[in-house]
Swiss-Prot record:
One of its GO terms (biological process) is L-arginine biosynthetic process. It comes from Pelodictyon phaeoclathratiforme (strain DSM 5477 / BU-1). Belongs to the ArgR family. GO terms for molecular function: arginine binding; DNA binding; DNA-binding transcription factor activity. The keyword Cell cycle does not apply. InterPro entries: Arg_repress, Arg_repress_C, Arg_repress_C_sf, Arg_repress_DNA-bd, WH-like_DNA-bd_sf, WH_DNA-bd_sf. Pathway: Amino-acid biosynthesis; L-arginine biosynthesis [regulation]. SUPFAM superfamilies: C-terminal domain of arginine repressor, Winged helix' DNA-binding domain. It is found in: Cytoplasm. Regulates arginine biosynthesis genes. PANTHER family: ARGININE REPRESSOR. This is Arginine repressor.
Length: 148
């Protein structure tokens, strides 16, 4: 059994069952004929972004939102350290090596507020379509690079 098939089965089980913890998930995997080590299951849960949430006093394992844009937005948001502006442009500081991805994400949004982006290693220069829109553009960037 490969990793993809195993993780697909985990997603299927979580969509069809109310699972409170990894032990219960491991048992459901075994019941379906999949033999998985606890350490492997733990890694799979981390890679899939599975969280435990308390609902009505009970815990339930949940998959993250399946909307790819929302997932990417959250990932890109984690890479951003700060967003600062002056009268003419906006500078986004990122984790080292992440500026290109953040710049590409902003370019993909095709906002009329953004004339263009230039990315280095850890800095993105965002050039507004008009200097009159700096405040609106900064808010737009915060909204589109947030984790929520």
């Amino acid at each position: 059994m490969n990793k993809y098939a195993r993780q697909l089965k985990i997603r299927e089980i979580l969509h069809q069952n109310s699972v409170g913890n990894q032990h219960d998930l491991l048992q459901l995997l075994h019941d379906s004929g999949m033999r998985v080590a606890q350490a492997t299951l733990s890694r799979d849960c981390a890679e899939l972004g599975i969280i435990r949430s308390r609902t009505n006093g009970n815990f339930k394992m949940l998959l993250p939102d399946d909307d790819p844009d929302k997932i990417i937005k959250g990932l890109v948001g984690v890479e951003v350290l700060s967003v600062n502006a002056n009268e003419t442009s906006i500078i986004i500081m990122t984790l080292p090596g992440r500026a290109h991805g953040v710049g590409s994400w902003l370019d993909q949004l095709k906002s009329p507020l953004i004339l263009g982006t230039i990315a280095g290693d850890d800095t993105v220069l965002v050039i507004p379509s008009s200097v009159l829109n700096i405040s609106a553009l900064k808010s737009y960037i915060h909204k589109n690079l947030s984790k929520n």
